[in-house]
């Protein structure tokens, strides 16, 4: 077979397969062109998932007849005036988008510059360019793409349904809209929901408003601001609380110099920053913007410009991981406020299921409405009917600014990792404890003061404007985990030598894994060695685990190491998994009775500990209900 030259139309169609692989890619390229033209308003219309029609209209600078004719020629661009591919400040730069689209569709362009008296129009039908003609057109450019991929049926065969393609196009527009909050974006489609993002103010507030418009208003309530700079690279944006996680990574928006990217370096850094806070298979929601000198990043490494390459990848990764970890630690004990709303919703559903009308903030009766008349009862006649809920001691009065110093209970110091060993609960002398605790002022501590323990599992604490419900095991597990990490970093893990070694029987593969990890485990105070086939001898344990079950700990560690080996988890992550397993075994269990002092000590330690709003598995350690919400449940709002 002899070699022959391909005709230009076929060459363009082959090239289009790299740049325009689906309608969403065409939409992205056209919107990027509008942004490069300094448009302040961009309108996108889709029909048939973009296969029937794509129309992008903008009010940018427009094009002259000469520019319009050149715009559909391959590798003709106005965005590389000096030919430097390492100083690119625009979204587009190759001059491939329009000729690629024109080779696989019917492409119509209409444009007018502000200084021109009329507009100009040009059509390209499946690679065949027509003549430029004058026309009427407001300032800006309108581009229509029809019959996309009609002449390449193989490409059409691999496209998804109209709804899926329209959603992909909407996502492409949303990502660009998030990166340019001061501009207006409208999107209309026959196959999926549209949107109209009005311009937002410059600065963090405007950026958060645009992110909230894309991700939903709940993100604004669960967002943490991020701002950092290192050696000329600036990081800004917002990240979601760890308890506000998602089932996939679609809510992760990453930008480099205003360009949406899906870069493995950046997503890996995000995963590393959140690894102590999220359960397996869950992903954070965030929008992060990196800005740097164009010379420090190469954007010409991917046909669709979805990936970039940094000159100093270690610097970028270090900045991202460090800034995100610091932000999450500064959030301290904060957890998502959605937990309270979910609890209220469940209460409302339960009320409805019991034959009562559903309770909602919209249908709550106000305090001024007349309550239904109840049949007379003897206990009502004895004075209960005169009780005024507004005089309830549970309602905050005007407390002193600070509780007495003697009422503050510290967990650190003599009790570095746990509680007092004497069990206490809600019987026996606990009534005295509760009466004494009732005199405390709960309003000046973020998590309030303990009032009761439910089912020996949950702590009820009163705050200034409501109460919090704490999962005692989940909260203590996070506290122990953070203290173990500090001890590991300081190399101060205390050990206890066992008088007689504990022998644990295990499958030989598990014994081999634990022996291979012996040096790592020794750093945490756990000394193990092989004890013949299928057995392991434990000679030393961390002193914090002296009251725990050593065999149970060894079995859990073996299971964790097996899972890590399957997932090829790096050593650093394995160390954290070992610590998390230690913490779980040492934490106070559900079903353990706690005294008021112990409960308050836990609350104070939570307030001082970074990340205590969620346990090691990413679940919230507490939920908060506001007094106003509680009152609405009872029709008093």
Curated annotation (Swiss-Prot):
InterPro entries: DNA_mismatch_repair_CS (IPR014762), DNA_mismatch_repair_MutL (IPR020667), DNA_mismatch_S5_2-like (IPR013507), HATPase_C_sf (IPR036890), MutL/Mlh/PMS (IPR002099), MutL/Mlh/Pms-like (IPR038973), MutL_C (IPR014790), MutL_C_dimsub (IPR042120). The keyword Electron transport does not apply. Residues 353-444 are annotated as: Disordered. Residues 378-389, 430-444 have a biased composition (Basic and acidic residues). GO terms for biological process: mismatch repair. One of its GO terms (cellular component) is mismatch repair complex. Pfam families: DNA_mis_repair, HATPase_c_3, MutL_C. GO terms for molecular function: ATP binding; ATP hydrolysis activity; ATP-dependent DNA damage sensor activity; mismatched DNA binding. The keyword DNA damage applies. Residues 396-406 have a biased composition (Pro residues). Belongs to the DNA mismatch repair MutL/HexB family. NCBIfam families: mutl, PRK00095.2-4. This protein is involved in the repair of mismatches in DNA. It is required for dam-dependent methyl-directed DNA mismatch repair. May act as a 'molecular matchmaker', a protein that promotes the formation of a stable complex between two or more DNA-binding proteins in an ATP-dependent manner without itself being part of a final effector complex. This is DNA mismatch repair protein MutL. It comes from Beijerinckia indica subsp. indica (strain ATCC 9039 / DSM 1715 / NCIMB 8712). The lineage of its organism: Bacteria, Pseudomonadati, Pseudomonadota, Alphaproteobacteria, Hyphomicrobiales.
